[in-house]
Amino acid sequence: MSVIKMTDLDLAGKRVLIRADLNVPVKDGKVTSDARIRASLPTIEAALKQGAKVMVTSHLGRPTEGEYNEEFSLKPVVDYLKEKLSAPVSLAKDYLNGVDVNAGELVVLENVRFNKGEKKDDETLSKQYAALCDVFVMDAFGTAHRAQASTHGVAKFADIACAGPLLSAELEALGKALDKPERPMVAIVGGSKVSTKLTVLDSLSKIADQLIVGGGIANTFIAAEGHSVGRSLYEADLVDDAKKLMEKCDIPVPTDVRVATEFSETAPAVLKSANDIKDDEQVLDIGDVTAERLAEILKNAKTILWNGPVGVFEFPNFRKGTEVIAKAIADSDAFSIAGGGDTLAAIDLFDIADKISYISTGGGAFLEFVEGKKLPAVAMLEERAKQ
């Protein structure tokens, strides 16, 4: 995957526009989780250090496109950046006709979704973004799967379009896990529905030596083995797809499970064999024997890709399966990459972030990359690198 990298360029005196992912939760005008901004800081600092005239922009939330709405303003992000950076930081509201920015300064360009045509990858808007800079830096992996004006269109028209350090690292880590993985390669796919992850499962079944399934997805596989799953979340119409996947790839289906008669945080967990699920029960976690068997598989892996918990880990009574898996990944010597919102929440809960080789910042983009799809923003950077 050949793209121009920001780290290979001399940015001194250049107008640099960084498309970051600063889409953070905000409450009462304050940033409540700064993980994405923290991840973007080294890119911004590197450009400032080189003496560039730095602009950074992002989307935040889902405002009505083309309308300013203070609720979705990047002002809380600007306040946060002012605390963290020694350089001057300001917010520009109207910037499409030009921005005054000095070397060593940072101007945050207001929420891109306030601009009409952003989501449709409008050519006029893309050219306006491109005219603001000498170098465009795409550093928002989380939006790389969307062809929008600030992620894709601008890269087409900017004098130079390159990948920022975050995006470069993300692509390298995913390439290491998927293109030429060290074997055995084990993939874990959790989540509620097979239907939303069918392409991912299919794609990984061709790469992985073993494919671990969890959550509601595992219930469809338990049903495919001929067991009743009671009132569990599962997809009867995808049982045949599950059977086909089991023929193609080694999928260790849970042999014991934790069930409850209601979906509730206080419901007591009952541990039982997977062939003994009653009609009024629902599976909410894998059982101890299954968890230990999967931990052993992970212990021997050389590459691990983790997407999704294996149970309803938000409920303390149904947390154990995901905890055992998380600890096994943390203790493994394998190259491990994890991605997806629920996965990141589990990593935080069990405090293992420093034990995972690479944590992906992109939810949808991570899944589309794993599915083998071309990410439009990355494809455009590759295109520009050839010119």
Swiss-Prot record:
Coiled-coil region list: none
Single Gene Ontology MF annotation: ATP binding
Gene Ontology terms describing biological process: gluconeogenesis; glycolytic process
SUPFAM superfamilies: Phosphoglycerate kinase
Protein name listed in UniProt: Phosphoglycerate kinase
This protein's record includes keyword Magnesium: no
Classification via InterPro entries: Phosphoglycerate_kinase, Phosphoglycerate_kinase_CS, Phosphoglycerate_kinase_N, Phosphoglycerate_kinase_sf
Family membership: Belongs to the phosphoglycerate kinase family.
Binding site for ATP: K197, E314, G340, G341, D342, T343
Key words, A-Z: ATP-binding, Cytoplasm, Glycolysis, Kinase, Nucleotide-binding, Transferase
Lineage, top ranks: Bacteria, Pseudomonadati, Pseudomonadota, Gammaproteobacteria, Enterobacterales
Domain of life: Bacteria
EC number: 2.7.2.3
Protein's UniProt keywords contain Isomerase: no
Catalytic reaction equation(s): (2R)-3-phosphoglycerate + ATP = (2R)-3-phospho-glyceroyl phosphate + ADP
Locations listed in the record: Cytoplasm
Intrachain disulfide bonds: none
Record: residues binding substrate: D21, L22, N23, R36, H59, L60, G61, R62, R113, R146
